[in-house]
Amino acid sequence: GSDVIGSLSPLVFDIYSFELCLLMSKGCSMVLIPDNLSAFPVMILKLLQEKKVSFIFWVPTIMVNIANMDLLSQMSLPDLKLCWFAGEVFPTKQFNYWHHKLPNVEFANLYGPIEITLDCTYFKIERELRDEEPIPIGFPCRNTGILILDENNQQVIAENVEGELCVRGTSLAMGYYNNPEKTAAAFVQNPLNKSYPEIIYRTGDIVFINERREIVFKGRRDSLVKHLGYRIELGLSL
C-alpha cells in the first residue's frame, strides 16, 4: 500500500508490535525514527514530511513538545491521515493544538496496559473538547469486556461514579513471569460471575463514565505514574 508508518517506538514496546502487524497485514511502509531525534522535534517533523508519513501511533510526550513550541504553525504535514496516541495522558490543551492545526487528520486516544496486549479501549475524537476537559479513553475494543468495580466489587453503571477499571476478554496475559503473588493479586476471578471460571485483570486505574457514556480516566489507586510510556513507582526508593 501507499501508507507510511512513522514509528517512534522502541522495538520492545507494545506499540511497535502493533505497527509490525499493521506493516505486514496492509503492505505499507515503515519509517523508524531514530531515538536521538526525540530531543529535536523539528527534525522529526521534517522526517515526516520527507517520507510522506500517513500514520503515527505515539506516546504523547513528543506531541506535547511540538505543541508547546508551536511548530505546526511553521511546518505542515500534508500526508498525515491518522494520528493515534497511547501510553500516558495527553493534556487536552496540547491535543487541541494538534486538532486545530491538522483538521483533516483523524485522531484517536487508545488505552491499555501491557497486561492486556496493547489496547482495550479506544476513543475517536470527533467533537470539540474544552482545554480543561480530559480526553475520554472511550469504549471497549473488539473481543474486550470492560468492568468498572467499586470498593465492594459491585459494578458501577451510574454516571460520574468512580471505580477501578477491570478487563476481560481474549487479550489478557496469563500472568507475570515467575511472580505468582503479583499474578494472583492482579488476575482474579470475575466477582460478578458465579457460574464458571472467568479471569479479569484489575488495572489499578480509577475511571468514571461521563454523561455521554464514555469512559474517562481519573487516576491511580496507587503511586504508579507513566512517563514516556514507561511505568514508574513513586513509592520506590533507590
Language model region names:
Residues 61-63, 90, 172:
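Alpha-helix capping/helix-boundary segments
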Residues 42-45, 72-74, 238:
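Short hydrophobic/charged patches on amphipathic alpha-helices used for structural packing
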Residues 9-13, 36, 114, 169:
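Conserved AMP-binding
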Residues 1, 7-8, 141, 146:
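Conserved structural elements of the adenylate-forming
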